[in-house]
Amino acid sequence: MGRSLKKGPFVDDHLMKKVEAAAESEKKQVIKTWSRRSTIFPTFVGQTIAVYDGRKHVPVYVQEDMVGHKLGEFAPTRTYRGHAGDDKKTKR
């Protein structure tokens, strides 16, 4: 289920302040955040946001087609190492 339309999208206040300050200063700096639950707004476009995945901060460059999605969608938390390989010796 998605979020109710009457509530509107959610962004943590501290993240919004950091993005607005970065937009005013016009410097290309990476914004660190732990807020994976925040929705990407149009003001985020062009910014690089380092999203925490539980181990490290993953840099995410925000593009126009990402607007409306959550930051956590672009920083996977699990590493997939693949299935076990075929063991030729045990098949015989």
UniProtKB/Swiss-Prot annotation:
Molecular function, one GO term: rRNA binding
Top-rank lineage group of the source organism: Bacteria
Among the GO biological process terms of this entry, one is: ribosomal small subunit assembly
Q: Name one GO cellular component term.
A: small ribosomal subunit
Q: Which residues form a coiled coil?
A: none
Keyword vocabulary terms for this entry: Ribonucleoprotein, Ribosomal protein, RNA-binding, rRNA-binding
One Pfam family this sequence matches: Ribosomal_S19
Record-stated family: Belongs to the universal ribosomal protein uS19 family.
Purpose: Protein S19 forms a complex with S13 that binds strongly to the 16S ribosomal RNA.
Q: Would you tell me the protein name for this molecule? A: Small ribosomal subunit protein uS19
